[in-house]
Regions:
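Secreted, disulfide-rich extracellular signaling modules
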Residues: 2-13, 19-432
């Protein structure tokens, strides 16, 4: 009996030592032999929200995502436009003039999509404007909000029909015949490429395209119809139809394809990648309330619009709780559920917490719509921040809290949050 008692006490000692070690990792070690543990639940209800413009880089690299093109009028955020900057390569070497004579007879822009393509806004046949870029665009230009190139030439405007109602998932291609002026431009550029460069043993197709891209800077494609939709295109290319004949006047036709290029000229600090940029013209609902706190609704607009900042003024009372270990800290933010049938729900929000003046977040987490329960709310778990907060002992006002949508979130839509009902739920262990 005595041996069993000694064994039981030994096991209990090991378990309590392990508990002390784990809680110590949270930054608040305890002495199990002296302290009484009690699990409690509390909440912080007064979160002070405001929304502000997100003026950071509004560029989406289409090579990593998809090509988003279109425009629409959001009932809250106003006019939103997505446009494409498309540098283009030849998929194979250009024609060798030393062997053939040639004539470009047709140029066709191909835009590929299917019924799974993302549509944001009302499905309407958009008016497409296609410009030729006259000069290269620097990295800094691309990173400028609402940037517009100063040197470009309008090639054409054309209304196209978008069919996203079919039940098939097969690719569909909308084609636009490019004008004679574009054919002349491409013809002149091809003839300026030295055949020695185009067919040198030391140069491959990419090297030839680098020569070509110094002469042809690509296309700028946008829609001029305000209340349409933003559509996700899977691909964009140009077919160049060419008639060739040899020294014996044998005639043939072939197709040279121009495809999207995908590299960065780091030496000259110039992008050679397809990029998507967004233009935003806010409505009065936004402009009248930017920066104001305690709004009934807080609007989060992705695709470079607006983000929310908030404060935890009631969080400082926890600084007096020196004998507390955080088990769970969950921030819940309800979502406005009014009808938005023309707009898909936002699938993701990101929460970032920074030290004031800090460039990089000390805590970050995300929440997607797939995880939204019947309570229609976002939930963020910030245990790591609460532990950090209690350990540092600084006021909550020394931190910056942001809710944003990711730049590359193609399926993003506006989010209408209800800050009055936002809460931070805290489950903790208290000992004394």
């Amino acid at each position: 009996m005595f041996k069993k008692l000694v064994f039981s006490l030994s096991v209990l000692t090991v378990l309590l030592s392990s508990c002390e070690k784990d809680l110590g990792n949270l930054g608040m070690g305890i002495m199990p032999s002296a302290d009484i543990l009690e699990v409690r639940i509390d909440s912080v209800s007064h979160l002070n929200f405001k929304y502000i413009p997100d003026n950071t880089d509004d560029t989406i690299r289409a090579s990593q995502n998809f090509l988003l093109l279109g425009s629409y009028i959001d009932p809250i955020f106003g006019k939103v436009r997505s446009e494409i900057f498309a540098p283009l390569y030849f998929s194979n070497p250009v024609i060798d003039e030393s062997k053939y004579q040639f004539e470009i007879v047709r140029a066709i822009l191909k835009m590929t999509y299917n019924d799974t393509s993302f549509v944001y806004g009302k499905i309407t046949n958009p008016l497409i404007s296609i410009y030729q870029l006259i000069d290269s665009i620097s990295v800094d230009d691309y990173r400028t909000l609402n940037f517009k190139p100063s040197h470009e030439t309008l090639l054409l405007k054309k209304q196209i029909e978008i069919d996203l109602l079919s039940q098939t998932q097969a690719d569909r291609i909308d084609t636009i015949d490019l004008p004679k002026s574009f054919i002349t431009i491409i013809d002149n550029y091809i003839r300026k490429i030295d055949p020695k460069d185009a067919y040198s043993i030391d140069l491959g197709p990419d090297d030839v395209n680098k020569v070509f891209s110094k002469k042809f800077f690509g296309l700028h494609i946008r829609t001029d119809f305000d209340d349409a939709a933003i559509i996700k295109f899977r691909d964009l290319a140009i077919d160049i139809k060419v008639k060739i004949w040899d020294s014996e006047n044998n005639v043939d036709t072939l197709t040279q394809e121009m495809i999207l290029s995908d590299y960065v000229d780091r030496e000259n600090y110039i992008y050679k990648q397809p990029l998507v940029k967004f233009e935003l013209k806010p409505s009065s609902i936004i402009t009248e309330n930017i920066g104001k706190s305690n709004q009934k609704n807080v609007y989060i607009q992705p695709m470079k619009g607006y983000k929310a900042e908030f404060q935890f003024p009631d969080l400082d009372r926890w600084l007096d709780s020196s004998k507390v270990a955080i088990n769970l800290a969950k921030l819940t933010i309800p979502i406005e559920t009014k009808d938005t049938s023309d707009y898909k729900p936002i699938p993701k929000l990101l929460l970032y917490i920074y030290e004031k003046g800090g460039k990089y977040p000390i805590s970050n987490c995300s929440f997607t719509s797939r995880e939204i329960n019947t309570n229609n709310q976002y939930e963020f778990f910030i245990n790591d921040f609460m532990t950090y907060f209690l350990k540092k002992g600084k006021s909550s006002s020394e931190y910056r809290y942001e809710i944003v949508t990711p730049n590359n979130n193609l399926y993003a839509n506006r989010s209408i949050l209800l800050p009055e009902n936002a809460k931070l739920h805290i489950t903790y262990t208290k000992y004394k």
